[in-house]
C-alpha cells in the first residue's frame, strides 16, 4: 500500500505541476544548500569513506539525475585517469581503443559513452570545454586527474545547463581558494612501473598551495595547482587477417576460407603530461564574489612500434598443408604458404608517432547578491586548444616461406622451423619497401559570455525563477597533409621491369649501397612470455624519425635502380598546401536563452519538489569548400566502340562553395522528486536535448566521379566494346548542412539512502533519437558540356536515421558497520547497467550482395558491412554500445589502512564495419547474378568491410594506502592485476573469427603524499 500511495502521489504531482531541474550550473547547488549538504565543489579530506558520503549527498540532494565521484583529498581521485574514474560510474563505459584507430590501444582509455551513447557534453567547472579537432568534446585523457576535486555525471540535464549532451553531461570540478578555511598545501609524488616495459620507470608529481586573506579591501584567496606525469608502457599485439574464400578447395567441392596470414607487433608508448591551474577569488563585500581561473593541460604523446605486417596480394594462390577447418570451412590450424609467388609477402615496419597538444581556459566569474531576492552572475570564458602531429612509417619487405598457425586456443600460436627463424633474421632477405607520412595541425578557439539571474520567492511553493543568456563564438581550423597518409613505394615487386618508370631490381639490404639503417627486433617477453615469435629485421627508430631527410635518401634508391634514367618520378613529401581536401575551416555562433522555475510542495504527505524550464538555442555555422570533378582519361572511343553517345561528357570542375546554416532548437525540461521519507525518494525527469555534429562531419568537400559501363567481345584488334551507360557517383567528405541530432530522454528512479555512505538506487531510462548522422545517398546535379543536367549519386553524411536506447541501472554501496569488530571497515560498491538499442535508417539500404562499384553498393558496405565473398551482413547494433556493464569494488578502511579492489566489465560491442585491418579492395565476387561472378582477375575491384567487435572485457585494479601521520601517507596502486587481454573479432559468414589480441600487462604505482 505504501508504494501504491507513492505512485498515486507522484502521478498527481506530475499532473499538477509540470516542472523540473538541477541547479548546479550557476556554481551553486541550491537544493543541496537547502538541505544543509555541501556544495558540489566541496573538498573532502578524510578518506574514501568520506568521499563516498560526499558523493552520495550530491546525488541525494541534487535537482537532477546525477552520479558523482569526489576526491578523497585534492589530487586524489581513485584512478590514474579521468576516463578510468568515469568508468566506475553506473551507466558509463570506457573505450579502450585509440580514438578512431581500433588497431591500437589507448592505455588510459580514449572516450566514454553514457547509457550506451557517445553524445556526451563535457564541461570544466560548469563551462563548456573541448579539445581541438572535433570542436565540441573534451578528450578526457588529456586532463590531469591530479587537478580535479570531483567529477559529476548528469544524465538528464535541465534547461539552465549548456546544451550539447543527449546521453549526458560530464562536469569536471576543480577547487577554489574559498573552499578551504585557510592555508592548504599538498604535495604528491609517485613512480609507475609497467611489467611489459621493464627498465622504464615513470615518475609523477603534483603540488597544491592555497590561502586566503582578510584585508581592508575585502577577502582575497589564491590557489595554485601544478601536476606533471610521465607514462611509459608497452603494448603487445597479434592479428589474424580476414579470411578469403577458396572456391571448391574443400571436400566435395566445398569452399574453404583461409586468412592471408597472421601478424604481430610491439609498441613502446610514452606520454608527458603537464597540468597548471590557478584560481584567484575576491570578496569585497558579503554580497559580491569574483573568481578568476586559469587552466592549462598540455601533453606530448610519443610511440614507437615494430610490426610484421601481411601484404599478400595473391591470396587465391595460397595453399594450406596439414589443414584443420571448422564445419563451415574456416581455417583453424595448418601451414600456410604461397609457392607460386616465391613466398608470402610481408613488411617489417618501424612506425613512430609524435603528437603535441594543449588546451587553455581563462574564465572570470562575478556573482552579485543584489538583495535577499535577486542574484546576478556574469561569466566570461576563453578557450584555446591546439594539436599537431607527425606519423612516420618506414618498412622493409620480405617473402616469408611459410607460416604455421594454430587458432584453436584463446590466442594464436605461431610455430616456425629453425630454417624459417634463420631466414627472418638474415638482413640479406629484405628489401626497402615503402614510406608513409602523415602530418596534421588542428586548432580551435572559443569566446563565451553568459549572464544568469535568479529571483528567490518568499512563497511556500515557488522557490526561485532563473533566466539567462549565453553567447559563444567558436572557430576551428583543421589542416592535414594531402594526401593524408602519403604511402609511397620505394622498390616494390611490381616496379621491376624494363620500361619507363620501372626498376631493374629491388633495393635488397645485401647490396652495400642499401644496407644501412636497419636492426634486429627480438620481441623480448612478448605477451609476458606466453607467445613466442621470431626476431626480424626492421628499419631503425632513427630512420623513421628523421623525416624528411631519411625518406629522401631511401627514395633515392628507386632513382639509382631506374631502368630508364630520367623516367622514374622523384619522391615528393606530403605538404600543407591550400588544397581544400586538406583544410577544414568552421565558424560557429550560438545564442542561447533559458528560463527555469524551481518549486516545492513541502506540506504534502509526500513532499514533491522540482523544476520546469525551457532553453532556446540558435546556431549559425559558416563553412567553405569545393566540389571537384576530374574527367576520366579512359573513355572508350574508336570504330570498335558502340554506344559511346550514352556517356555524358563533363568538363573539369573545381567550384568553390560557401555555406551558412542556421537552426533553432527549443529544449524543454522537467524534473520532479517525491520524498517518501528521509531515506526513500523517487524521481521523474523528461527533457529534450541536442548534440551538434563535430567539425570533421561538417567539412564542405565533395568529389564527383564518372565510370563507364560496358561489355566486350572478341580479342586483340577484333575486340568489340559495347557501352551501356555511365555510373555517376560521388563522395562527400562532410556535409555543411547537417543538423544536430536531437533526443528526448525520460528517467524514473527509486533511491534508498539507508546510511551516510549506504544506498540502493534503481533507474529506468529511455532515449528516443532523431536526425542521427549516418552515411547515406543524395543527388548532386551537374550540367554536361551540352548543357544537359545529370544527377550524381553522392555518398556522404546526412541526418538519415532515428533510434532509441533504453534500459535499467542498479547501484549499491555500503560499509558494514553491523559486523563483528574485527571485520569493521569493510564496504562494497556494485552497479549493473542493461541497455537495449536500435537504429533505423530513414531510407533503408540493404541488399544481399555488395559489388563494390556503384554508390549504393558502397553505402551498403559502410552501413551493413560486406564479406570477402561480397555478401552483406546488416542488422548491426549501435556502434560502441555494450548491452551489459558491471562494476564491483571491495573496500576496507580502518585506522591507518585503506584498501580497494575494483573490477570493471563490459560486454561485447561493435567497433565499426569498415575499419583498417578488416577492410580491403581485393575480395572475390560470389554473387551468382553478378557479371564478375568468380572472376578472379577482377578481384581487386571488389571492396569489403567486416563488422569488427571488441569481445567482453573485464579488468581488476587495486590500491592499498597506509596513513603514517594525519599529514603523510604512502601507498601502492595496481592496474590490470589479472593481466587481461583485449580481444577483437571479425564477423564473416563462416563464423565469428578472432582478429586481434592486445595486452599491456599489469602496471604498479608507488605513491606518497604530504599535506601541510
Predicted regions located by residue number:
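Short loop/turn motifs that connect adjacent beta-strands in outer-membrane beta-barrel proteins
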Residues: 161, 177-183, 214-220, 287, ...
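C-terminal beta-signal and adjacent terminal beta-strands/loops
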Residues: 484, 489, 904-925, 936, ...
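Outer-membrane beta-barrel signature, preferentially recognizing the C-terminal barrel domain
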Residues: 353-359, 586, 690-761, 767-769, ...
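Extracytoplasmic beta-strand/coil segments of soluble accessory domains associated
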Residues: 83-128
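Gram-negative outer-membrane beta-barrel transporters
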Residues: 766-768, 773-778, 785-915, 978
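N-terminal periplasmic "start-of-domain" segments of outer-membrane beta-barrel proteins
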Residues: 44-80
